[in-house]
Amino acid sequence: MLQKHNKVKQTSVVRLMKYRGGHFGGGGLSTAIYSIFAFFSIPLWEKFMTFYLELFSILNNLVTSISKGIL
């Protein structure tokens, strides 16, 4: 159980690093939010952040596609 939780935490961090440079302002806000949640390290927050990153990635891709379409 604990091992699984740690794995989830690692993938969240990896995802964060992937997205960090990609979106508006280099992702400073999401990095700050993630740091706060990671500090408390509550499994519920981990799940929330994973969801947040997935959602942000989708929105980021959508915005990028739309801007490329316009330009």
From Swiss-Prot:
Main localisation: membrane
Membrane topology field: Single-pass membrane protein
Segments traversing the membrane: 24-44
Annotated compartments: Membrane
UniProt keyword annotations, A-Z: Membrane, Transmembrane, Transmembrane helix
Record's GO cellular component terms: membrane
Protein name per Swiss-Prot or TrEMBL: Putative uncharacterized protein C922.09
